[in-house]
Structures are given as C-alpha cells and as structure tokens.
C-alpha cells in the first residue's frame, strides 16, 4: 500500500493529491475497477482478442 508522509507546512489537500497520484501510478485504481466484478475466462479472452484487433488496425 502507498504511504504519504505530510510535511511540516503541507496541507492535507496536497498530501491527498500526492496519495491519489501515487495510487494511479501504481495502477491500484485500475486494478480495483478490473476486479470489481467477476469475469468469466471466456469473457476475458474475448476482451483480450478484441483489444489486440483494435491495436492491430490503428
């Protein structure tokens, strides 16, 4: 888990922004969204195939 230590003259808002930025860089939020609902293996394969097809034709 990410940790943010607040400096002497740092506001809570700026520390919260740093924390959110760290989570986003670590990919935690994307992982949470991905695991929010169970996805059958067949659906995962289909999504992966469609993503590859989109990448190929762009």
UniProtKB/Swiss-Prot annotation:
InterPro entries for this protein: Ribosomal_bS21, Ribosomal_bS21_CS, Ribosomal_bS21_sf
Which intervals of the chain are annotated as region Disordered? Answer: 36-58
- Which gene is annotated as encoding this protein in its UniProt record? rpsU
- Similarity field: Belongs to the bacterial ribosomal protein bS21 family.
Q: Which organism is it from?
A: Symbiobacterium thermophilum (strain DSM 24528 / JCM 14929 / IAM 14863 / T)
Q: What PANTHER family does the record point to?
A: MITOCHONDRIAL 28S RIBOSOMAL PROTEIN S21, SMALL RIBOSOMAL SUBUNIT PROTEIN BS21
Q: Does the keyword Glycoprotein apply?
A: no
> Which PROSITE patterns does the entry link to?
RIBOSOMAL_S21
Q: Which NCBIfam families match?
A: S21p
Name of the protein: Small ribosomal subunit protein bS21
């Amino acid at each position: 888990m990410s940790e943010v230590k607040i400096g002497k003259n740092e506001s809570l808002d700026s520390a919260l922004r740093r924390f959110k930025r760290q989570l986003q860089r670590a990919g935690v939020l994307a992982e949470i969204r991905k695991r929010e609902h169970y996805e059958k293996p067949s659906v995962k394969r289909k999504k992966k195939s469609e993503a590859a097809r989109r990448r190929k034709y762009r």
